[in-house]
Amino acid sequence: MKETVIRKLEGLMERYEEVQALLGEPNVVSDQDKFRALTREYSQLGEVVAGFQQYQQAEADLQAIEEMLSGDDAEMKAMAQEELAEAKQLIERVEAELQVLLLPKDPKDDSNCFLEIRAGAGGDEAAIFAGDLFRMYSKYSERRGWRMEIMSTSDGEHGGYKEIIVRMEGDSVYGIMKFESGGHRVQRVPETESQGRVHTSACTVMVLPEIPEKEIPEINPADLRIDTFRASGAGGQHINKTDSAIRITHIPTGTVVECQDERSQHKNKARAMSVLAARLAQQEEDKRRAEADSTRRSILSTGDRSDRIRTYNYPQGRVSDHRINLTLYRLSEVMEGDLDSLLKPLQQEYQADQLAALSENN
């Protein structure tokens, strides 16, 4: 391993011990924001430190084996020769794992996020599929111990949703869910299809990191048009009595956000502004990423409907992720929330792309 990398790892080990000490200080324990941030850092550093300690032990073991090989004892030399290849393989594996752990982290990966699902081509069947996707993400969220909160819904005429916006909260939510942005296509026989023909419908999914309230940039009020209207759909007796629903239009970009899930107009406006800030920030990020490197393919999609990332084929029980040419014949398990079988290979491919980019830059 390069000396510069070892020095970096030694520095991270020192920081790990420093954070460990800080977490025991009363002024840190009493400051919940600082305590949470340090706890998260301690957990992340712990993985790197454990890997580095394993590397140090493997290097020490290899050195001992090489000393045995240079000795005069024939029996010890034979035993050391058997262990040599295994020791070298272990060092290579641990080095590769440390390389991944040292990849630059996107600070947004630890953020909560907004999940937006919209029905696309396919009419009623697309809306029903949007409902199926929401259920799939809800099941996955339960498995991971995340919390989901519905921000806004527009119901489909025969079930499902024309649009649903959800806030997701928990450990590394955005870092894991960001791979879901893009076009999702379903191939199946709709319940209303009497001839048994397979139809193709589509939905778009957008995953946006939530911007902390303190970091939301000022938006010029002159750039906003705010409309109130009566909420529609299921929701109890208060529905249609007051204009509590909010629609905010960002005039320069044409971005529109609606929120109608709360009874309070003030709460709906605050929620809509939060989603709007996330969308505007993502638009800037997409533009920056495109300008920075238009030649390199990216597993991360912009969430554009033309960017089809996955197909769910019900007759064959198949789900295919087109970004990494992955096909699994376990559609029912995926729809019940087993998304890790798709997301983990995507994360590995993304890390491989990052490593390749670092190598090119170096």
From Swiss-Prot:
One Gene Ontology molecular-function label: translation release factor activity, codon specific
Which InterPro entries does this entry report, sorted A to Z?
PCRF, Pep_chain_release_fac_I, Pep_chain_release_fac_I_sf, Prokaryotic/Mito_RF, RF-1
This entry carries the following GO cellular component terms, namely:
cytoplasm
Ranges of biased composition (kind: Basic and acidic residues): 282-296
Q: Which SMART domains match?
A: PCRF
Originating species: Tolumonas auensis (strain DSM 9187 / NBRC 110442 / TA 4)
Q: Which PANTHER family match?
A: LD18447P
Q: What is this protein called?
A: Peptide chain release factor 1
